[in-house]
From Swiss-Prot:
GO terms for biological process: DNA-templated transcription termination. The lineage of its organism: Eukaryota, Viridiplantae, Streptophyta, Embryophyta, Tracheophyta. May regulate cell proliferation and plant growth. GO terms for molecular function: DNA binding. Residues 76-86, 295-311 have a biased composition (Acidic residues). Residues 134-152, 163-186 have a biased composition (Basic and acidic residues). This is SAP-like protein BP-73. Expressed in tissues with high cell division activities: in root tips, stem node, panicle, flower and immature seed. Weakly expressed in root and leaf.
Length: 375
């Protein structure tokens, strides 16, 4: 390896072949020699080639003398080239070679301290570069291992997540299937139970006999009471005359009391006549009492009622027979002023028996006038 002793020095120009140019280009490419000034001037330009070619033509024209000078010239050129090559290859850290026109080296110098320092620096740089390269090579497998471990951990986590998701999906599907199965089983059970109940109901309905038509039993009700059932019957003209005769007899006996009562009575305080009411005669004959005693039931019958009730009797109560000889006296009494002594109820009964309408709303004086006019 050739290093220049000083940055200011330059190699002399060499007029020869192009081999020196290749060496100069190689030296210029070294990183340690770039800051140093190294000038290798190659004068092998096309003009030199032209001069040589012109010389060759001259030698060819000149004859044998020129032929003799040509081998000597070639020998000198070859010697110069060999010396230059040997100098370059022999001295690595030596001083630069200076070539003169005679192509002879002037002197060889011993490598100095600066050159040694440069060589040591170059070695240190190489060692550092090698160490860095080794460190990078060592870091690469570590990083690859770490990445591989991370990738394996990530892949395991992904697998676990996928597995958990799959398990959840499977569990959800199983739950849904179980719910569907339970629903189906419940529905089938309900259908079976309903079908069984329907069959049982139909069988029971078939077994039950049809109910017979409702018939109300005949009632055996009989009313048993001590009071005779007497209903007011419409009084005919014949019956009315008989009743009036009985009333006249009673009126004659109770004349003084009736006159006092008639004076105190007012038409507004008269009670309305009830059609269902029965007037009981004050003086009854012995025959009437006998008939009433016959109609009344015994005490033994009322104390111990039988299982069957007696049907209500619709017979007309017996009326005492009055002689027709009293008709003349009745007519005379009706025509006279005795009507004013009668009560309002008695006057209304007389008006009813004679077929007068609206007697229930009439007052006592009106009834007396009507009856007196009709008489």
């Amino acid at each position: 390896m050739l290093l220049p002793p000083h940055p200011g020095r330059t190699l002399p120009a060499y007029h020869g072949d192009n081999r020196f140019l290749l060496g100069a280009c190689f030296l210029s490419k070294l990183p340690m020699l770039r800051p140093m000034k190294l000038s290798l001037v190659c004068s092998a330009n096309p003009n030199n080639h032209r001069s040589r070619s012109s010389d060759i033509t001259r030698h060819q024209k000149g004859g044998s003398a020129r032929r003799k000078s040509k081998p000597y010239q070639e020998k000198d050129d070859s010697e110069n080239i060999d010396e230059f090559d040997t100098d370059i290859m022999s001295s690595k850290n030596g001083p630069p070679i200076s070539l003169t026109s005679n192509s002879r080296p002037q002197a060889t110098s011993v490598p100095g301290e600066r050159e040694k320092e440069i060589v040591e620096l170059f070695k240190r740089v190489q060692a550092q570069l090698r160490a860095r390269g080794k460190g990078k090579e060592e870091k690469k497998p570590e990083q690859a291992k770490a990445q591989g471990e991370r990738g394996s951990v990530d892949s395991l986590l992904n697998l676990l997540r996928k597995h958990s998701v799959d398990q959840r999906r499977k569990s959800g599907d199983e739950k849904e299937q179980s719910v569907d199965q339970t629903k189906r089983s419940n529905e089938s059970g309900n259908k079976q139970n309903s079908s069984i109940f329907i069959k049982n109901d139909t069988q029971e309905e078939q077994k039950k006999p049809h109910p017979a038509a409702f018939k109300r039993p005949a009632s055996n009700f009989r009313r048993r009471s001590p009071v005779p059932n007497v209903k007011f019957q419409p009084v005919t003209n014949v019956d009315a005359e008989r009743v009036i005769n009985n009333i006249n007899d009673a009126v004659q006996e109770a004349k003084p009391t009736l006159e006092n009562k008639a004076a105190t009575d007012e038409p507004d305080s008269v009670s309305t006549f009830e059609p269902n009411s029965v007037i009981e005669p004050e003086n009854l004959s012995l025959d009437d009492l006998d008939h009433i005693s016959d109609d009344e039931p015994d005490a033994s019958d009322t104390d111990e009622p039988s299982g069957e009730y007696d049907e209500p009797s619709l017979q007309i109560p017996s009326v005492p027979i009055i002689d027709e000889s009293h008709d003349t006296t009745l007519k005379s009494s009706l025509g006279g002023p005795d009507l004013s002594t009668l009560k309002v109820t008695e006057l209304r009964e007389l008006a009813k028996s004679r077929g007068i309408k609206g007697y229930s709303k009439m007052k006592k004086n009106d009834l007396v006038e009507l009856l007196s006019n009709m008489a």
